[in-house]
């Protein structure tokens, strides 16, 4: 873990909290180049009616616009939740150097077919991965969000509103 990992993860957590305020799953991401944030993203799939509007994808898109290049060499992506398969694909193709995430994505194990999350050619460039940075803060944000959602759903279901 690098000295700056906690700082940049806290920036991603801030974005995740904004995502939650707009009714989205609280996930935030920042893309960093030379210790500077060049891309930010928060989940907005529901708001934008876009299944690809994940925090990671948005941070990568913003970073690519900033660098004027889709190849995001020598960058680090910080994200509050381990990326899904779609986001892993975008991360691999963007050629970032490093991925840092907070909470583990427990459902990902259902979909991975190869060791170490790499389901592509072994000769492809590898990405350094640092896991569970500020894990409890990231996990708590997600669990409290889903507890509230379940409580609301149960209330409506039990009162025959749905």
From Swiss-Prot:
Binds 1 zinc ion per subunit. It comes from the Bacteria. Zn(2+) binds at residues 54, 84, 87. The keyword Metal-binding applies. The keyword Nucleus does not apply. One of its GO terms (biological process) is tRNA wobble adenosine to inosine editing. Its EC number is 3.5.4.33. Disulfide bonds: none annotated. It catalyses: adenosine(34) in tRNA + H2O + H(+) = inosine(34) in tRNA + NH4(+). CDD domains: nucleoside_deaminase. One of its GO terms (molecular function) is zinc ion binding. Residues 3-115 form the CMP/dCMP-type deaminase domain. The active site is at residue 56. Keywords: Hydrolase, Metal-binding, tRNA processing, Zinc. Homodimer. Belongs to the cytidine and deoxycytidylate deaminase family. This is tRNA-specific adenosine deaminase. It comes from Buchnera aphidicola subsp. Baizongia pistaciae (strain Bp). The gene is tadA.
């Amino acid at each position: 873990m690098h000295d700056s990992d906690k700082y940049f993860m806290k920036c991603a957590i801030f974005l995740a909290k904004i995502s939650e305020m707009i009714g989205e799953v609280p996930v935030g991401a920042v893309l960093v180049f030379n210790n500077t944030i060049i891309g930010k993203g928060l989940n907005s799939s529901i708001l934008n009616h876009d299944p690809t509007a994940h925090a990671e994808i948005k941070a990568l898109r913003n970073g690519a616009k900033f660098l004027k290049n889709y190849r995001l060499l020598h960058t680090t992506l910080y994200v509050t939740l381990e990326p899904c398969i779609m986001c892993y694909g975008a991360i691999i193709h963007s050629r970032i150097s490093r991925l840092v995430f907070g909470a583990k994505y427990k459902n990902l194990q259902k979909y991975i077919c190869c060791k170490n999350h790499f389901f592509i050619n072994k000769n492809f460039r590898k990405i350094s991965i640092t896991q569970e940075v500020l894990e409890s803060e990231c996990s708590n944000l997600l669990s409290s969000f889903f507890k509230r959602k379940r409580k609301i759903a149960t209330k409506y279901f039990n009162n025959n509103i749905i």
